[in-house]
Amino acid sequence: MDNCIFCKIIKKEIPADIVYEDKEFLAFLDIRPLAPGHVQIIPKKHYRWVWDVPNIGQYFEVVKKVALAQKKAFQTDLIRSQIYGDEVHHAHVWLWPENGSGAKENFKENSELIIKNIK
């Protein structure tokens, strides 16, 4: 999709603080974070809704991997998740640590913490 901001991030036309990337999926820090380490996880192929992603099991394995990294990175037991779709018409899952440590505006530090804890 030519006007999709997430597709532009995938193509590296728009910069993003990427915390995870593989052949199928990309995870990056939200530019308007609700909390330190707030991440968007998207498929690299454009799908309108999460439920349209054919390899949804693999998608949620990535969601789990990022959530577990956030849990360690921000020293919290609670990672919130939400599936949206109205604001950007590209499948995406939000993940953010509840009551986590750190400042939400520290993009570089927050991305490094998540990357360090992804297994």
Describe each model-derived feature in a short phrase.
Residues M1-K119:
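HIT superfamily nucleotide-processing domains
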